[in-house]
């Protein structure tokens, strides 16, 4: 039996279902971190034999066992209950990676019937899931299905205008289509699907939780509309299901979407958690969100800031005052806003070629992260001191976001000539990270040129242009409202030199850049990376825009 509740300051529990771990962060009323607990999938649940929390198979398929998440939650709650006074927790919220949970039509479990004397994983056995190993965000096996959907909807621009996103490798709609075509037995026995964040919230709350609109907008099946009038696209569902009847079945799997903006409580914790661990019955269950959006929210950025998250996929996120979908970026309704306020949105640029290329370059040229960091620091920008003999490298191990979705390979250039390897091997770490940052620099400016950020855009200013998450104290003072902080001149028209090479922006103009870049993730801990990011606008002046596209 759990210990009786003790008096003391209120605590708040945040759960994160990451690719490699299930983590719990405990904070107090002042948002001071009290402690962290984690279950590492590879080491503490080694019976599943995952590597980095996932299985890899030929064909760029990356999956993870859903049953492992359930067992990890049992272990994590045991850790938390041993080390903290459970009765002091007032609220639980969380986030999760991008993945789907496929429930069988029979038996769909009754959460209120769970026996508090038994762990969750003994009652939610693997046979309740129609798909035991579900694709994760790194999975690209469904890319051809995403392209088929895109073609059906009239191409990338028409698809983005209709459902808010164009085709990409981990599109949820494409995963559904692939399962129907490749695994009809899984399709036939499915009765419900949930995104991972809603799945985790359901386990904590003891009742079915639907996805929020921010996640629905990323599926490729949702039509966003003002005033909370969004809806599932019947035409897309019919295409995925193969018929109108199966389309209606998919609609029933998806369930209702929370269009309130996420600024409300889902409910309270389940009777199971109250009886087994000693949570108070009135412990609030807050909205659970996708991990990338929770990262953005956790740093409390101002509207003029951008958040750069390094990880298995690198992400650059910022806010937007209105909904203007294009193929150039992903856009989501803000997951935590008051329904009475003007709607806000979050834009995301992503790169699939992130941690893996960095780790490969480390292994090939330095053998350690400290040496990797050192070489980035000591090698001059562009890999050489001279102005005319700069080096470029592009590590595209997976098809990346538009316009590089069709390109794969490792490409190096010296003095404008493609080479197999640099003469100075030490330039590789620096040139890799530069190309990753330059990719975001170019795509940011293309995004700004669409007008999504309004008539004005942020100005990169001062020495505080880049801040790591650990050093971020507060948003820019006085930055309020949908466009506060995005000061400076209107977005400039691209000069003739830029337009002749097909650019819609001036690559030498830094005034459209964000006021600050708040960085998080493992790579953000490298001083060299922070220093390189501070050169965000300076290194752009040596970018021969379009050089990669012209040479590939």
Which residues does each predicted region cover?
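ATP-dependent carbohydrate kinase catalytic cores
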Residues: 218-339, 470-498, 527
């Amino acid at each position: 039996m759990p210990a009786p509740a003790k008096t003391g300051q209120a605590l708040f529990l945040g759960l994160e279902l990451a690719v490699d771990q299930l983590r719990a962060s405990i904070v107090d009323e002042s948002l001071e971190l009290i402690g962290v607990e984690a279950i590492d999938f590879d080491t503490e649940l080694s019976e599943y034999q995952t590597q980095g929390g996932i299985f890899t198979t030929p064909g760029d398929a990356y999956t993870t066992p859903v049953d492992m998440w359930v067992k990890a939650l049992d272990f994590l709650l045991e850790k938390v209950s041993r080390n903290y006074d459970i009765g002091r927790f007032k609220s639980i919220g969380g986030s999760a990676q991008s993945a789907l949970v496929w429930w069988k039509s029979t038996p769909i479990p009754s959460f209120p019937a769970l026996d508090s004397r038994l762990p969750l994983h003994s009652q939610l056995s693997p046979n309740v899931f129609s798909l035991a190993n579900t694709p994760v965000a790194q999975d690209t096996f469904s890319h051809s299905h995403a392209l088929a959907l895109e073609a059906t909807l009239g191409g990338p621009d028409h698809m983005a205008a209709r459902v808010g996103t164009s085709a990409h490798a981990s599109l949820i709609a494409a995963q559904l289509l692939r399962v129907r075509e490749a695994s009809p037995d899984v399709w036939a026995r499915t009765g419900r699907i949930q995104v991972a964040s809603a799945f985790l919230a359901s386990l904590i709350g003891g009742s079915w939780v639907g996805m929020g609109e921010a996640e629905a907008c990323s599926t490729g099946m949702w039509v966003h509309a003002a005033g909370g009038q969004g809806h599932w696209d019947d035409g897309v569902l019919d295409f995925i299901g193969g018929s109108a009847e199966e389309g209606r079945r998919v609609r029933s799997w998806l369930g209702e979407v929370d269009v309130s903006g996420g600024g409300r409580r889902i409910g309270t914790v389940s009777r199971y958690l109250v009886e087994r661990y000693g949570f108070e019955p009135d412990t609030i269950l807050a909205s659970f969100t996708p991990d990338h959006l929770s990262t953005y929210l956790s740093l409390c950025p101002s509207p003029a800031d951008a958040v750069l998250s390094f990880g298995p996929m690198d992400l650059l996120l910022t806010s937007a005052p209105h909904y203007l979908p294009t193929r150039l970026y992903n856009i989501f309704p803000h997951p935590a806003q008051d329904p009475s306020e003007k709607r806000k949105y979050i834009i995301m640029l992503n790169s699939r070629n992130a941690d893996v290329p960095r780790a490969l370059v480390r292994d090939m040229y330095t053998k350690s992260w400290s040496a990797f960091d050192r070489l980035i620091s000591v090698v001059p920008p562009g890999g050489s001191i001279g102005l005319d003999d700069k080096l470029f490298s592009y590590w595209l191990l997976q098809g990346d976001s538009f316009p590089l979705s069709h390109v794969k390979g490792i490409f190096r250039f010296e003095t404008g000539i493609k080479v197999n390897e640099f003469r100075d091997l030490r330039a590789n770490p620096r040139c890799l990270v530069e190309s990753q940052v330059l990719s975001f620099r170019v795509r940011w400016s293309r995004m700004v040129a669409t007008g999504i950020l309004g008539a004005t855009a942020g100005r990169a200013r001062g020495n505080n242009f880049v801040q790591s998450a650990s050093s971020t104290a507060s948003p820019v003072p006085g930055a309020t409202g949908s466009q506060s902080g995005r000061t400076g001149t209107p977005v400039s028209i691209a000069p003739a030199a830029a337009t002749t090479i097909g650019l819609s922006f001036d690559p030498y103009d830094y005034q459209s850049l964000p006021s600050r870049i708040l960085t998080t993730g493992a790579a953000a801990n490298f001083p060299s990376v922070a220093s390189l990011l501070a050169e965000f606008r300076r290194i752009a002046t040596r970018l021969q825009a379009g050089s990669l596209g012209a040479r590939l």
